[in-house]
């Protein structure tokens, strides 16, 4: 499902990242993709939109029984939101060499100095998650964009 959301982002000329949140008690409660360009909002990452949807669905900012699935390792903003939402787990696809905040550059959700920690599982369908990003940015370079 997260890859389907990434494809929607790709088709909307957004960086193709998709996110899904699953509640252990309710099932899938949120699906989102990047919308920074369309919304003209630097915080409109797939994870942030999905967390907002999930909080609405759960009627709580505490997402203690929810797992975030995302196609790219979350950035510092999104990793911080996971901590603030008290989510127990993040499952991501491709590593984020430029802004990864779960494994690559930082380990925000695992930082013992914070009031909450989340388990991180990385590399799930990494090849497929990375391929859509590679395809998107190759097309942008070919067009002389970004």
Segments predicted by a language model, with ranges:
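Glycine-rich oxoanion-binding loops at beta->alpha junctions
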Residues: 48-53, 121
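Immediate flanking context of iron-sulfur cluster ligation sites
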Residues: 60-72
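A short, polar/charged loop-to-alpha-helix boundary motif
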Residues: 38-48
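Short, basic and Ser/Thr-rich N-terminal targeting/leader segments
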Residues: 13-17, 64
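Small-residue (primarily alanine) positions within well-ordered alpha-helices
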Residues: 2, 6-9, 19, 30, ...
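Zinc-dependent deaminase
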Residues: 1-9, 28, 74-146
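Short beta->alpha transition motifs characteristic of CBS
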Residues: 29-36
